[in-house]
Amino acid sequence: MDKIAIISDVHANITALNAVLDDIYSRGISRIFCLGDSVTKCCNPDLVIDKLRENCEVVLRGNCDESISSPNAKLKSFWSRVKIGEERANYLHNLPVMAEFYMSGRLVRLFHASPFSTSHIYNPMYSNQNTLREVIELGSPMQLFENTEFLGKTPNDPIPDVIGYGHIHTPNVFRYKNKTIFNTGSVGMPIEMANDNNLQNADNRFSTLASYIILEGIYDSKELSTFSINLVRVPFDIEKEIEYLENSDMPGKDKIIKSLRTASSN
């Protein structure tokens, strides 16, 4: 059986990324895909980009990667852009928005946020409490499976069986109309306490952990066989990452420090 580690939303947190990579390699996994948002939030975007380039077979583009590579980047993004330099900014700008492959007879499609852009929001954790937001932002979960021009697809292309995405920083796996959808959560900026109403005032020890997904099956096989999706949580030294932030001149770092400690939105 083959294993693929799917990570996302590292957000310049080199401490969390190192912890997750150590966990991945300790499991004998060598194939790693990243679904975007490598930068912003934390203060080591240059180190994170270089580490991802060294270790990931696939890196996709997220909305923060787009914002940092824009000449009109806002203050916090501009700070990160200056730190990464032009070559890394060009690298982010040219990243693909989608990856797909067959695994154990299932077509798996990966993107950062949705088939429509790198910034649409679909969060099933809101489905019961806030259907209006779901409808406004994206609508039915089946829209995640659409073949869109943004992805470089045509209506005649095969429809995926499994969708994997990041962006919302809330890990989950669920089935819908015989399809499978998973979210990796975030390596570098877990904010699960903010995204799930059931966790309000709950113990945040587990919500502050980095998360990623392991797919297990036969890679590049169209023949139906055993397939599994596993969600992994990894502790990392939050205070070490906070020390990096405190010693930096990055704007807005106080909100990021609070988020790292509480898993709440900044």
Write out the residue ranges for each language-model feature.
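Structural motif
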Residues: V58, V108, D161-V162, K179-I181
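Core catalytic region of metal-dependent phosphoesterases/phosphodiesterases
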Residues: D2-H93
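Active-site environment of divalent metal-dependent phosphoester hydrolases
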Residues: H11-T15, T40-C43, C64-S70, F116-T118, ...
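His/acidic metal-ligating clusters that form di-metal
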Residues: R27-G28, E87-F174
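Acidic, His/Gly-rich catalytic cores of divalent-metal-dependent hydrolytic chemistry
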Residues: F174-N266
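Beta-strand-turn-beta hairpins that frame and shape the catalytic cleft
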Residues: M1-A5, E100-R109, Y176-T180, E223-F227
